[in-house]
């Protein structure tokens, strides 16, 4: 966490980025990351919901359940994700926020699965860990709203 915070602080030195947490699973990560970024920054949240499955040959539709409270025009925006997988949700969020005239938009993710990408040009600038395609719970990650409270990430093996 300290390494990510230091890298972000170095890249945004002299600026005051807006960290935008994508709820709900990122909540613990964005809180820890915010404390690890030793420069002035703002913090705001969005919540998105995805329906359908692009992986099954269908179309995924994404809708915003909670929008930003802050004005991001001319601000550097750093989207904070729990995991970037296909990239469809992050792509939707990036494109939506870009319409509001920010100075820049980039992303940081705790877990990354680049081998599952369906979108190639995502601005994922900071990655905690590249992980295999397994189910993680705890540290804000859930399975049907359970296990978020666990203090660390754990692999969940379904039988």
What are these regions (language model features)?
Residues 1-159:
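PRPP-associated nucleotide enzymes
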């Amino acid at each position: 966490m300290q390494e990510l915070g230091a890298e972000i602080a170095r890249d945004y030195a002299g600026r005051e980025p807006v960290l935008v947490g994508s709820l709900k699973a990122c909540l613990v990560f964005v809180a820890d990351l915010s404390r690890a970024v030793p420069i002035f920054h703002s913090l705001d949240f969005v919540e998105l919901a995805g329906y359908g499955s692009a992986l099954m040959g269908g179309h995924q539709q994404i809708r915003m359940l909670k929008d930003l409270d802050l004005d991001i025009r001319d601000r550097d925006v750093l989207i904070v994700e729990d995991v970037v997988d296909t990239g469809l949700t992050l792509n939707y969020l990036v494109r939506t926020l870009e319409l509001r005239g920010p100075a820049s938009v980039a992303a940081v993710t705790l877990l990354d699965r680049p081998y599952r990408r369906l979108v190639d040009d995502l601005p994922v600038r900071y990655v905690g860990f590249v992980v295999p395609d397994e189910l993680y719970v705890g540290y804000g990650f859930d399975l049907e709203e359970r296990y978020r409270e666990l203090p660390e990430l754990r692999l969940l093996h379904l039988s």
